[in-house]
Structure formats: C-alpha cells, structure tokens
Swiss-Prot record:
Reaction(s) this enzyme catalyzes, per UniProt: 3-deoxy-alpha-D-manno-oct-2-ulosonate + CTP = CMP-3-deoxy-beta-D-manno-octulosonate + diphosphate
PANTHER family associated with the record: 3-DEOXY-MANNO-OCTULOSONATE CYTIDYLYLTRANSFERASE (PTHR42866), 3-DEOXY-MANNO-OCTULOSONATE CYTIDYLYLTRANSFERASE, MITOCHONDRIAL (PTHR42866:SF2)
Enzyme Commission number: 2.7.7.38
Lineage of producing organism: Bacteria, Pseudomonadati, Myxococcota, Myxococcia, Myxococcales
Record GO biological process: CMP-keto-3-deoxy-D-manno-octulosonic acid biosynthetic process; lipopolysaccharide biosynthetic process
A Pfam family annotated for this UniProt entry: CTP_transf_3
Function according to Swiss-Prot or TrEMBL: Activates KDO (a required 8-carbon sugar) for incorporation into bacterial lipopolysaccharide in Gram-negative bacteria.
SUPFAM superfamilies tied to this protein: Nucleotide-diphospho-sugar transferases
Protein name: 3-deoxy-manno-octulosonate cytidylyltransferase
Any one GO cellular component localisation term in the record: cytosol
SS bond list: none
Natural source organism: Anaeromyxobacter sp. (strain K)
Name of the gene encoding the protein in the UniProt record: kdsB
Length: 242
C-alpha cells in the first residue's frame, strides 16, 4: 500500500477575504471542515494543513487536526511541497487540496488518488460542464488525449465546435491535484511557463515542460469560498444537508 498524504495549503491574507480559513462556518473554522472531510476519504494516511500563520495552525490543532508550519511560499503548491518534506514517514503520494473547499466530497479525493496508477506522476479531476459554463472564464476547461492525459487547460471555450453549440467533449477542471512525492519536487523546481502566465493556470507549467497530467472524472462540482457571499451560500448548503 502506498503512503498517501492530503496536504491543505492555507494562508491568512487572501486579498478578497482576509482571514478566510478562520471564518466561522456552522460553529467551526472553515479550514476545519476541509480537514474533517478529507479524513473521510478512503486510502488516505495523513491529512495536514500547511500554513505560515500561527493563528491558522492553532485553530487546526484546536479542532483536532495536524498543522505544519512553513515559510513564506510563492504558491500553494510550493507550500505543500515544503510540508511534505517535513512528514515522517515521507508520503509516496501527495494530494494538494485547496483550503477553501469546505464541501469537498471524499469521493473526489479518492478519485484523484485512484488515478495515480501505471506510472502516473500527476493527476487532477474534471466534471461535465453545466449549461452556459463553456463561455465563462472563471470556469477552467480541459481537453484530453484518448489516454486520459490533458492536452490543454484554458479559460477559453475549448474545444470549439464548428457545427455550433457546446461540444459534449468539453469538461470543467476541478482543482484537486495528486503528485508522486518525487514529481512534486520536480514540478516546484520548474520555471513558470509562458502559457501558465497568460492563462493564470499553474498546472500548465507541467504541460509546457513536457510532463503529462492524468485527468479523472468526478461528479463533484467544486465549491471554493472566495468571498463572504460564498460563505453565506456554504452555510445555506450545510444547513440543507450538504
């Protein structure tokens, strides 16, 4: 059995919602919900929050979770890589789970872990597009090869359907990632790519440098908390049994 760690990067100073990980959601910090749901995923050995903020670390520990203090990091992936180095035993598979996903479904975590077979070094998820999402730049689209590896991720409507209408091949990216521990180190050492900069999509760095990303299917739609309004929606969904 492979040793699997889910590492959740969290920072205090989000520009649109400072202090977001500590925001109250149904009587506990938002970040605690992410930790609790990640622990329900089968095949996970360790769940830890990676942060450079003592307040977040304390809140996680008070809620019964594990927190790893890191230095300042350029990206969440860099923070995850640093935290993975501090775990003992060192994980073989590292899942990078965003800290603003309090409604994450354990099955989505299981799906991305399950994609790490047959020499796959990096994996992520995709779901069917809802009506009207193809044109929305906030929804990242992905197209894949027959093998299931990503051809490209874009905020643009891909693929374009010459016959008109939305292509049944279009899928929305869900931003959960799994890496082998070795490839996580490789990835974070790569120079940022030009397309990565144009699209503001970090995963394009792997494709630009010639590495594959396996894309697995999920029914989880993703629900990140970016604003106080999003938090209110999450409260309503939790109250409804989400």
């Amino acid at each position: 059995m492979r040793h699997v760690a889910v590492i959740i990067p969290a920072r205090y100073g989000a520009s649109r919602f400072p202090g977001k990980p500590l925001a109250d959601l149904a009587g506990k910090p938002l970040i605690a919900h992410v930790v609790e749901r990640a622990k329900r995923a089968r095949g996970v050995d360790v769940v830890a929050v990676a942060t450079d903020d003592d307040r977040i670390a304390r809140a996680v520990r008070d809620a019964g979770g594990e927190a790893i203090l890191t230095g300042p990091a350029a990206t969440g992936t860099d923070r995850v890589a640093e935290a993975a180095r501090k775990l003992a035993p060192r994980p073989e598979i590292v899942v990078n789970l965003q800290g603003d996903e309090p409604l994450i479904e354990p099955e989505a975590i299981e799906a991305v872990i399950g994609a790490m077979e047959g020499g796959v070094r990096m994996a992520t998820l995709a779901r069917p597009l809802a009506a009207g999402e193809l044109e929305r730049t906030q929804v990242v689209k992905v197209v894949t090869r027959a093998s299931g590896d990503a051809l490209y991720f874009s905020r643009a409507p891909i693929p374009h359907r010459r016959a008109g209408g939305e292509s049944p091949l279009a899928r929305a990216h869900v931003g959960i990632y799994a890496f082998t521990a070795a490839f996580l180190e490789t990835f974070t050492a790569l120079a940022p790519g030009r397309l990565e900069g144009e699209e503001a999509l970090e995963q394009l760095r792997a494709l630009e440098h010639g590495y594959d990303i396996r894309v697995a299917d999920t029914g989880y739609r993703g629900f990140g908390i970016d604003t106080p309004d999003d938090l209110e929606r999450a409260r309503a969904l939790l109250a409804a049994g989400a």
